[in-house]
Structure formats: structure tokens, C-alpha cells
Amino acid sequence: MPSLPQERRRTEHRNPASGRLDRLPTKAILRLMNREDRKVAFSVGQQIPSIARAVDAIVSSIRKGGRLIYVGAGSSGRLAVLDAAECPPTFGVSPNTVQALIAGGRKAVTGAVEGAEDSARNAVRDLRAKRLARNDVVVGIAASGTTPYVLSALAFARKRGATTVAITSNRKAPIARDAQIVIAVDVGPEIVTGSTRLKAGTSQKLVLNMLSTAAMVRLGHVYDNLMIDIAQTNEKLRQRALRILTEASGADASTAKHALRQSGHDLREALVMLKNGVDAKAARARLIAAKGNLRQALGE
């Protein structure tokens, strides 16, 4: 599989600002890291047009019953696993809706699996196991843009007719070949040469945040800026759900708590009850008639 020569990979260049890094005192190291990190959000901002295209593709896919599948290796894969894992509790979606594949499997989440990222064959095997379909979106994440596991996944996904997206720090890398949408965030060389868990990793986390969050907002899993579909799986989250309901409805805590009980702790249903002055059965009927569109059910 072709690779990008190291002299052309920005992620492998030496950073002139950190040339004497090992001689710096602690605070100087931290200030340098902080200065470099400030560049990341700006660089991500330059990619908003591409990120927006990816979000719209994800929204369209999920509306058709498709899935968002992240693919990465090492730090990139771990960030993918993290983002996918947070979607069910935050937005109330099925764990199948947003998934992540990491080279080396579950063991690679907490430790290095030697050679896993070099296996192109395993990427195809892993996507076959997911029963990849045309309605799915596959997002390959690789700072270098040359990771065989990720490149193979994108090539296979494109052949299957799925939408393909690349997140990289090297625009001219091979990862762009099979990606219909390329999100190339140029964060410049790392302060520790080649350590892409730093700025490149931070940029990946920001982009993943944007992809999943904006998609879920567009899909109606947020009301105003409130997590209306939050999973109420522990006491902290049950209290948060109560606060969300009081803020969204304007009702006092006692009234909101009663509505939650009446609705079977369904936040959407409870909100329709309180804002429209109806009982749980009527609220449920309005949501069904609106096909789950909360604002439509509320008449807003």
C-alpha cells in the first residue's frame, strides 16, 4: 500500500519552536504546549465547510436507517471509541447508530497491539462483520493519512457504496484517495516530533465532537441546547433530566417530577404534557403524529 514520504508529512516535521525542549523548565514546556494548542481550534475552523458536508451526509444516512462507523488505529481509534461510546447516553440513540472500529480490537483500547494498524486484511474483515451497507457512513481517522488499516477500510467502504470521510493532518496523503469528503486539519509539527497524540489528536477530538454533536442536533435529539433524549441510567442523570424538564417547561421541580413519573420518565412526553397542558396519553399521541419531531408535537 502506498505511503507518503516522511519529508512530505507535516506530522513528521520537527517543530522549530521546541528545538531545545529537553532543556526547558516545567512551566516553559507547558506554556509552549499551550501556545501550540491554541492553533488547533483555528485550524479546525478552516475545515468547517468539509465538516458540514460530512455532518449532512451522516444525518441523511441515519435518517435512512444507516450508521456512522468510525475507523482508526492507536490514538485515533481510541478517540473514535470514546466519541461513539458517548452517543447513547448523551442523545438516547442505539449503540448501533454510532460505532467505532479500532485496529487490534478491544485490547487496543487500553494498550498497544503491535502491528495491528498495518493489517489491511483485518479492516475488511471487521467491516464485513458489521455488515456494511450503502446507507452507512465510514469515517477513517489517521493523522498521517497512511495507516493501512484505515486506508483499507475506506477503500472497501467505497466499493460497497457507503459514504466515505477522511480525517487527517496531511491533505496529500493516500487517505484522500478513497474519501469522498476530506477533513484535513493542518495543525503543523508537534512539539515532540511525530507524536500525533498531541495537536493532531486534539484536532481529531474536536472534529469528532462536531460530527456527532451537530448530526444529533440536526436529527432532533436536542431541544434548544438541552439533552432531551438523555439516558436516565443513574441518579445523577435522573436529576439532570429533572433539571432539563424544569428549564424547558418553566414548571417547578415538583410538577416536573410528577410529569416525569406519569410519562414513564420519557422527557419528550413529559415536556409535551407540561407545555401543552395534556395528559401522558395525549402527549404520546401528539409525538406519534409528529413522527417524533418534538417541536412539531409542541406546535412550535
Residue ranges and their predicted role:
Residues 1-43, 47:
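Cofactor-/ligand-binding subdomain signature composed of acidic, glycine-rich
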Residues 32-40, 100-111, 223, 264:
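Gly-rich Lys/Arg/Thr-decorated short loops/hinges at beta-loop-alpha junctions or inter-strand turns
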Residues 57, 153, 211:
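Aromatic/hydrophobic pocket-lining residues that form π-stacking "cages" and hydrophobic walls in ligand
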Residues 69-206, 215-217:
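Glycine-rich phosphate-binding loops that contact phosphosugars or nucleotide phosphates
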